[in-house]
């Protein structure tokens, strides 16, 4: 049987790697949209309520920690001996979606909620919204 050329083998391995990765989005590093079910109520008693699939941002972003440079040590009075850099999975774009609420009887209401439109790895913040 004749051997395949090196170009054919490289192409085959590339196609194999791409098709294997299609079903593994959760394993891919980064920050991605992730759907979840949310129940919306008009008040605490649940007079009107409805459900909707909203989008969240879920994933892993890069972080690292390393010994601080000498200039950082001196500037901090030798208290800042470790420097860490990190990013968090963050919502970078929102959109409003309308949720239909079913009320007591046959009455209906409509309510707007926010859902994630886009995600990205960004600076970690205690509270952004």
UniProtKB/Swiss-Prot annotation:
Disulfide bridges in this chain: 31-89, 48-103, 57-119, 61-121
Segments traversing the membrane: none
UniProt-listed GO biological process terms: adenylate cyclase-activating G protein-coupled receptor signaling pathway; cell surface receptor signaling pathway
Signal peptide residues on this chain, from the entry's feature table: 1-23
UniProt KW keywords: Disulfide bond, Glycoprotein, Hormone, Secreted, Signal
Tissue expr: Found in a variety of tissues.
Location, primary (coarse class): secreted
Subcellular location: Secreted
Gene Ontology CC terms, in alphabetical order: extracellular region; extracellular space
Subunit-level organization: Heterodimer with GPHB5; this heterodimer interacts with thyroid-stimulating hormone receptor (TSHR), and hence stimulates cAMP production.
Protein name as it appears in the record: Glycoprotein hormone alpha-2
Species: Homo sapiens (Human)
């Amino acid at each position: 049987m004749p051997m395949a050329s090196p170009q054919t083998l490289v192409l085959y391995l590339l196609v194999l790697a791409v098709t294997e990765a299609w079903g593994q989005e959760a394993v891919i590093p980064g920050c991605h949209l992730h759907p979840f079910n949310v129940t919306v109520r008009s008040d605490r008693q649940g007079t009107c309520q409805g459900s909707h699939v909203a989008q969240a941002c879920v994933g892993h972003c890069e972080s690292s920690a390393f010994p601080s440079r000498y200039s950082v040590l001196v500037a901090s009075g030798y208290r800042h001996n470790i420097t860490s850099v990190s990013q968090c999975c963050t919502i970078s774009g929102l959109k409003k979606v309308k949720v239909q609420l079913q009320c007591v009887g046959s009455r209906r209401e409509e309510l707007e909620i926010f859902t994630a439109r886009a995600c990205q790895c960004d600076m970690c913040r205690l509270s952004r919204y």
